[in-house]
Amino acid sequence: MSHLVKMENGQSQTIQEMLGCIERYNPDHLKTLEAYVQDQAKNNTYDLEANLAVLKLYQFNPHMLNFDITYTILLKSLTSLPHTDFVMAKCLLLPQQMKDENVQTIIDLADILERADFTLFWQRAEVNRSMFRHIAGFHDSIRKFVSHVVGTTFQTIRKDLLKELLGGIEDSTLESWIKRNGWKHQGQGLVVVAMQDDKIKTKNITEKIEFDNVGGLMAQCL
């Protein structure tokens, strides 16, 4: 859905155009930006700059604070891990937002993800599933982050452990994630995450430098 922002002169701008000028701080545009946040949740899209602009407008206009939009922005920023979007969003929160129980729950979920305690995350996510039910693709976005961590941590991993880290998914769903990441079955319940030949190999390079090559440079430094 295309969101247009109505200017005082009667003309319209796209949200991206509006964010590039001083109009991004105009509270008259907040409702349009909030609707844009809701569309991101519904359509599995993401616009960090617009979402941060909403939080900044809340800072300037605390009386216009919308907690539901705040939750959605924070949860959408989690779907961007391992990028630092959540940290940036968190830094813009007002004291009353930080004191909110749901905000604290989301912050706890973020901490758990950053510690890579994925089993605990899925347990907490199940308890709080109503919080992000409206965010399309949320679970798969987190699984993408889990896959990133697994890919940088393991060479091989037990199939049952991988299934647990991805949220206790069905075998058919696990197979699709294995295929998506280019992993392979090894047998004996193991999944090959990274072949040894795929690992970057270090190489020592020795370069012989003659004194005549650097003598002039050293003389200039004296």
Swiss-Prot record:
**Which locations, inside or outside the cell, does it occupy?**
Cytoplasm
Keyword tags: Cytoplasm, Initiation factor, Protein biosynthesis
Write out the GO MF terms.
ribosome binding; RNA binding; translation initiation factor activity
> Is Protein biosynthesis there in the keyword field?
yes
Q: Which InterPro entries match?
A: ARM-type_fold, CSN8_PSD8_EIF3K, eIF3k, PCI_dom, Transl_init_fac_sub12_N_euk, WH-like_DNA-bd_sf, WH_DNA-bd_sf
Biological process (GO) annotations?
A: formation of cytoplasmic translation initiation complex; regulation of translational initiation
The organism's superkingdom is given as Eukaryota
For the keyword Membrane, the answer is: no
Q: Give an example GO cellular component term for this record.
A: eukaryotic translation initiation factor 3 complex
* Pfam families recorded: CSN8_PSD8_EIF3K
Q: How does it assemble?
A: Component of the eukaryotic translation initiation factor 3 (eIF-3) complex. The eIF-3 complex interacts with pix.
Give the family this protein belongs to, as stated in its UniProt record.
Answer: Belongs to the eIF-3 subunit K family.
| Role description | Component of the eukaryotic translation initiation factor 3 (eIF-3) complex, which is involved in protein synthesis of a specialized repertoire of mRNAs and, together with other initiation factors, stimulates binding of mRNA and methionyl-tRNAi to the 40S ribosome. The eIF-3 complex specifically targets and initiates translation of a subset of mRNAs involved in cell proliferation.
Name by which UniProt lists this protein: Eukaryotic translation initiation factor 3 subunit K
Which organism's genome codes for this protein?
Drosophila yakuba
Query: What phylogenetic lineage does the species belong to?
Result: Eukaryota, Metazoa, Ecdysozoa, Arthropoda, Hexapoda
